[in-house]
Amino acid sequence: MKIRTGTDIIEISRVKESIESTNEKFCERVYTEKEREYCENKKMQKYQHYAVRFSAKEAIFKAISDELDNKFEINWKDIEILNDEKGRPYVNILNKKIQNIEDIDISLSHCKQYAIANVVVIFK
């Protein structure tokens, strides 16, 4: 068993600018439909929720990059960050080529200016 960690922090204003300057094309490229629906339902804090999901995906990329076979590319939407019925975040890996992950623990936080994510990935 191998364990890797990943952490990422981002300014929320950068994500907001990316979304607004591309007329949502950024969202379509980076976030799944379920992620977009969740963030859009947050109204006043939607950019914080978009940013923390972006940060989470970056943290996961950092944690798994050394363990992946470079024969295939990982896309942003191969990793989905959702929340359970109690509001706790969890990760769905949608790319079937990523088979050697046993579990991913995730912690997300955001404030007015920053979003941060920390992940612990356990490999089989």
What is each residue range found by the language model?
Residues M1-K124:
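Core catalytic alpha/beta fold that binds nucleotide/phospho-ligands
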